[in-house]
């Protein structure tokens, strides 16, 4: 049985509003998250992802409220990430109505938290979000040539991105959300070599993120090994609809819902 490719709009939420910028900078307002979520559900999105881009510093209460209101409106799986540090954070988001929770910086600081979360809530609930970039010139290379970053791609960790995805799978996460910081917001297409490298290293689903700008960008990401494709600005500002992306995947003889 072939599993259908999932098309996932990503909503970056800052203080209760959807925003989008390049590499998380120059953020412009893209609307109300609950309204946008309902629109994408109606358009045929397979899942939704909310990333709380203020969360690593700010208040969590606003996001809990957004999740609760969204979960009342939509009938597709909702993943929420940003500022998720503890088992308690995961519990709070799942109770508010999230179906999955994505973890990023906290896992870099203490990888074992991934095992604790997946054992408590099940692998299917836990997504490891990997913000990866090409290692900059003048810095020690990693085995794959990509490194994990934090702080919206601004801070390199020196951790090899492919090895980190592999470690996440070993620690029990159910999916890898692979975000290319080199491609993020550029609209020049997904990072296909990075997708291929991570696909070869893990057997769990890989969600490709970063770089979608045109309808023809999506099928190559799936052909490179992505199980799902995630995009933000092309959907929020009306460049593409979910239906157009699914049609392009069908045209490439890929299975979609």
Swiss-Prot record:
It is an enzyme of class 4 (lyase). Pathway: Amino-acid biosynthesis; L-histidine biosynthesis; L-histidine from 5-phospho-alpha-D-ribose 1-diphosphate: step 5/9. Gene3D superfamilies: Aldolase class I. This is Imidazole glycerol phosphate synthase subunit HisF. One of its GO terms (biological process) is L-histidine biosynthetic process. It catalyses: 5-[(5-phospho-1-deoxy-D-ribulos-1-ylimino)methylamino]-1-(5-phospho-beta-D-ribosyl)imidazole-4-carboxamide + L-glutamine = D-erythro-1-(imidazol-4-yl)glycerol 3-phosphate + 5-amino-1-(5-phospho-beta-D-ribosyl)imidazole-4-carboxamide + L-glutamate + H(+). GO terms for molecular function: imidazoleglycerol-phosphate synthase activity; lyase activity. NCBIfam families: hisF. It comes from the Bacteria. GO terms for cellular component: cytoplasm. Belongs to the HisA/HisF family. IGPS catalyzes the conversion of PRFAR and glutamine to IGP, AICAR and glutamate. The HisF subunit catalyzes the cyclization activity that produces IGP and AICAR from PRFAR using the ammonia provided by the HisH subunit. The active site is at 12, 131. Its EC number is 4.3.2.10. PANTHER family: IMIDAZOLE GLYCEROL PHOSPHATE SYNTHASE HISHF, IMIDAZOLE GLYCEROL PHOSPHATE SYNTHASE SUBUNIT HISF/H IGP SYNTHASE SUBUNIT HISF/H. It is found in: Cytoplasm. The keyword Coiled coil does not apply. Keywords: Amino-acid biosynthesis, Cytoplasm, Histidine biosynthesis, Lyase. Heterodimer of HisH and HisF. It comes from Nocardia farcinica (strain IFM 10152). It holds the Pfam family His_biosynth.
């Amino acid at each position: 049985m072939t599993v259908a490719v999932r098309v996932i709009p990503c909503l970056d939420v800052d203080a209760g509003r959807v925003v989008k910028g390049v590499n998380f900078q120059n953020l412009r307002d893209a609307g109300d998250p609950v309204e946008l979520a309902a629109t994408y559900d109606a358009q045929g999105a397979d899942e939704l992802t909310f990333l709380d881009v203020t969360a690593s510093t700010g208040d969590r209460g606003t996001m809990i409220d957004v999740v609760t209101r969204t979960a009342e409106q939509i009938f597709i799986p909702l993943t929420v990430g940003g500022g998720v540090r503890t088992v308690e954070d995961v519990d709070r988001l799942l109770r508010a109505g999230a179906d999955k929770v994505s973890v990023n910086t906290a896992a870099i600081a203490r990888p074992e938290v991934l095992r604790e979360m997946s054992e408590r809530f099940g692998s299917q609930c836990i997504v490891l979000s990997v913000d990866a970039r090409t290692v900059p010139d003048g810095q020690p290379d990693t085995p794959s040539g990509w490194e994990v970053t934090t702080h919206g791609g601004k801070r390199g960790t020196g951790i090899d991105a492919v090895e980190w995805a592999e470690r996440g799978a070993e620690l029990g996460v159910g999916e890898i959300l692979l975000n290319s910081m080199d491609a993020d917001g550029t609209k020049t297409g997904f990072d296909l070599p990075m997708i291929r490298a991570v696909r070869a290293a893990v057997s769990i689903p890989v969600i490709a993120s970063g770089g979608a700008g045109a309808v023809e960008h999506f099928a190559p990401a799936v052909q490179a090994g992505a199980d799902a494709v995630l995009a933000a600005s092309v959907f929020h500002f009306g460049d593409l609809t979910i239906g157009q992306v699914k049609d392009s995947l069908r045209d490439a003889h890929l299975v979609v819902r």
